[in-house]
């Protein structure tokens, strides 16, 4: 099975302009993401998907591969779809979408989503990762997306709110979503063609579009957390983690 990992990277960000090139211990963040991903077993190729020449130059500077996408991409999925069309991937090729703000992603987490497709061929169209929240401050933080899933580990919903809500207790596990997706090229193209979902638009979470249109999302629970860099303050958290990693 051919497995291509794509890292979408956008220079513009309302909260943190130039985020992919922000230095973390002397390296741009996108380099940390790329190098972490390259340690995962089972990958055929890794590319950064971007529309920015500064990001392209930085990636090529450390020996990485880049696919240039349209600056008019309306969403991360549109950028991924543009990239896979340029790369000429086959319908059944597996695509891993690793968000470019995950400089501490554990390579085994990437291997987990690949393994789901290997062990359950044809049972679902999309897979992703969850992690049980241990930092209580994340429970009610809308920047940390929460998720619920059924007994067979199929996603039921994703929300910026705390879900599920315990009416009579606060002592129960809550899982957050980690920014890794896996799907076939065929599904990416079908997904990108779907109209914006009502819930997707409300929560600003693209994965809800898949659920709204009846597609299954298989979930693997990671043993490792991954810090998402949303603000300059998150850079310091990453550097502290890397100091003991």
UniProtKB/Swiss-Prot annotation:
CDD domains: CMP-KDO-Synthetase. It comes from the Bacteria. SUPFAM superfamilies: Nucleotide-diphospho-sugar transferases. GO terms for molecular function: 3-deoxy-manno-octulosonate cytidylyltransferase activity. It is found in: Cytoplasm. Gene3D superfamilies: Spore Coat Polysaccharide Biosynthesis Protein SpsA, Chain A. Pfam families: CTP_transf_3. Its main location: cytoplasm. Its EC number is 2.7.7.90. One of its GO terms (biological process) is lipopolysaccharide biosynthetic process. One of its GO terms (cellular component) is cytosol. Keywords: Cytoplasm, Lipopolysaccharide biosynthesis, Nucleotidyltransferase, Transferase. It is an enzyme of class 2 (transferase). Pathway: Bacterial outer membrane biogenesis; lipopolysaccharide biosynthesis. It catalyses: 8-amino-3,8-dideoxy-alpha-D-manno-octulosonate + CTP = CMP-8-amino-3,8-dideoxy-alpha-D-manno-oct-2-ulosonate + diphosphate. Activates KDO8N (a required 8-carbon sugar) for incorporation into bacterial lipopolysaccharide in the Shewanella genus. Belongs to the KdsB family. This is 8-amino-3,8-dideoxy-manno-octulosonate cytidylyltransferase. It comes from Shewanella oneidensis (strain ATCC 700550 / JCM 31522 / CIP 106686 / LMG 19005 / NCIMB 14063 / MR-1).
